[in-house]
C-alpha cells in the first residue's frame, strides 16, 4: 500500500503513516511506563511494610490497635499448627514496647521491637552501617533516627519506658538501617525479643503476638481465613482469645493509596489507548483517501469490498505492530535504565521511596501487548468501512 505507491500519493501518505506509527509508539511507551511504575510502587511499599511486620498477625483480642499490647501465650503447638497453613512460609513470635529516647540535645518517641529470626533478613538487606544486634543491650536504629538524635554506631543512649513507673534502659547502637520509609524509620528500633519481654514483665511464651509471612500476597485473605479458623476458638493458656489481622487492616491509609494508584493506571491506559487509536484511525483514513483511485480501479476489475477492507486492515496491523515494536523497545529500555541506575529520584517522605521504582512482570507485559493490539485492531474496523462507500463509477468519472 503506502510503501508501494508511486508519485504524489506516496509523498502524501508517507508523513501521515509516520505520524500514526509515532503516535502509537508514544502511547504504548506511556502505558508501559505507567504499568511498570505502578507495579514497582506497590511492590516496594508492600515489601517494606511487610518487612517491618508481616502479612498476618495473631494478637490478643483485647488489644486496641496500639503498640502497648496485651500478651498472648504463643505455645509451640499453636506455632506448629500455623506453620501448616497453605502459603505460610514463616511463623515467628514478636514483642513491641513504646518508649522515649532521650539524648543531651533531643528526644524522640520510638517503638522497640524484638522478633525471633525472620526480620533479620529484611534489616540486613537495608543495613548501611555496623551489624545486627546480638546481645540484650544492643539495638539497631535507622539512619534517619540517628540523624535526628545526633547518634552514630557504637554510641550509647538511654531509653525510658513508662508504665506505672518510669524505667530507664541503656542501649548500644550496633548498626544503622535505612529503608527510605520515613514513617517507620523514625519509629522502630530493633532489639532482642527477650529484652522486650522483660520490659513488658512477661516470660516464657508470653508475647505480643505471632507474625506470619506468606509466599504469595494475592493469597492474603485466603490464608487469613485459614489462620482465623485455627485461632478463633482456641484460647491460650491464660484464657485469652486471639484476633487475626492482615497487613492491609493494619495499614489502611497506605493500601487505600495503592488502590487509588491502580485507578490512576487504568485511567492513563484508557487515555493513551484513545490517543493511539485516534492516531491510527487518522492514518488509516488518510491511506484510504489517498488510495481512492486504486480502490475504484480494483473494484472495476472485480475486487469485493470485503477483500479491499481486509487489505487495509492488514496494512493497519502492520502499522500498529511497527508502532508497538518501537514502543516496546524504547519503553523497556527506559524501564531498564531506571531499574538499574535510579535516574529519576523521589522525595521518600512523600512517596515512601527515594526513586521511581520499576517492576515489569512478564504476564502484565504480555497482557498489555495483546490487549493493545486487539483493541487497536478493533477500532480499525470502523474507518475501514469507508472502502465500501467508494463508487468505481464516480472515481472513474472524476478521473
Give the label of every model feature segment:
Residues 32-40, 262-300, 308-311, 383-384:
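A hydrophobic alpha-helix feature that marks transmembrane segments and, especially
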Residues 310, 325-370, 381-389:
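Short helix-loop junctions at transmembrane helix boundaries
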Residues 80-91, 96-172, 195-200:
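Short acidic/glycine-enriched loop/turn elements at secondary-structure junctions
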Residues 151-238:
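Basic-flanked hydrophobic alpha-helices used for secretion and membrane insertion
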Amino acid at each position: 500500500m503506502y510503501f508501494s505507491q508511486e508519485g504524489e500519493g506516496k509523498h502524501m501518505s508517507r508523513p501521515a503513516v509516520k505520524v500514526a506509527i509515532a503516535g502509537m509508539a508514544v502511547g504504548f511507551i506511556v502505558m508501559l511506563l505507567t504499568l511498570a511504575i505502578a507495579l514497582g510502587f506497590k511492590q516496594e511499599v508492600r515489601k517494606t511494610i511487610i518487612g517491618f511486620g508481616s502479612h498476618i498477625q495473631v494478637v490478643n483480642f483485647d488489644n486496641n490497635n496500639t503498640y502497648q499490647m496485651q500478651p498472648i501465650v504463643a505455645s509451640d503447638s499453636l506455632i506448629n499448627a500455623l506453620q501448616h497453613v497453605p502459603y505460610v512460609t514463616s511463623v515467628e513470635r514478636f514483642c513491641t514496647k513504646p518508649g522515649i529516647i532521650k539524648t543531651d540535645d533531643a528526644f524522640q518517641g520510638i517503638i522497640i521491637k524484638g522478633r525471633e529470626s525472620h526480620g533479620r533478613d529484611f534489616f540486613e538487606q537495608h543495613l548501611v552501617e555496623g551489624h545486627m544486634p546480638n546481645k540484650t543491650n544492643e539495638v539497631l536504629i535507622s539512619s534517619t533516627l540517628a540523624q535526628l538524635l545526633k547518634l552514630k554506631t557504637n554510641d550509647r543512649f538511654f531509653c525510658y519506658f513508662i508504665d506505672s513507673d518510669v524505667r530507664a534502659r541503656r542501649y548500644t547502637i550496633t548498626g544503622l538501617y535505612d529503608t527510605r520509609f520515613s514513617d517507620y524509620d523514625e519509629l522502630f528500633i530493633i532489639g532482642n525479643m527477650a529484652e522486650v519481654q522483660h520490659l513488658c514483665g512477661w516470660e516464657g511464651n508470653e508475647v505480643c503476638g505471632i507474625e506470619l509471612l506468606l509466599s504469595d500476597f494475592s493469597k492474603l485473605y485466603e490464608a487469613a481465613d485459614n489462620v482465623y479458623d485455627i485461632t478463633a476458638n482456641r484460647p491460650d493458656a491464660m484464657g485469652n482469645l486471639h484476633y487475626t489481622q492482615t497487613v492491609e487492616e493494619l495499614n489502611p491509609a497506605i493500601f487505600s493509596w495503592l488502590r487509588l494508584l491502580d485507578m490512576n493506571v487504568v485511567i492513563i491506559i484508557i487515555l493513551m489507548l484513545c490517543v493511539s487509536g485516534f492516531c491510527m484511525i487518522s492514518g488509516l483514513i488518510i491511506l484510504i483517501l489517498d488510495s481512492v483511485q486504486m480502490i475504484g480501479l480494483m473494484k472495476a476489475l472485480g475486487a469485493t469490498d470485503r477483500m479491499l477492507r481486509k487489505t487495509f486492515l492488514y496494512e493497519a496491523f502492520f502499522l500498529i505492530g511497527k508502532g508497538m515494536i518501537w514502543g516496546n523497545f524504547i519503553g523497556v529500555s527506559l524501564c531498564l535504565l531506571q531499574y538499574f541506575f535510579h535516574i529519576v529520584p523521589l522525595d521518600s517522605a512523600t512517596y515512601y521511596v527515594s526513586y521511581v521504582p520499576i517492576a515489569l512482570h512478564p504476564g502484565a507485559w504480555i497482557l498489555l501487548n495483546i490487549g493493545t493490539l486487539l483493541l487497536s485492531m478493533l477500532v480499525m474496523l470502523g474507518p475501514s468501512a469507508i472502502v465500501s462507500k467508494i463508487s468505481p463509477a464516480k472515481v472513474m468519472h472524476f478521473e
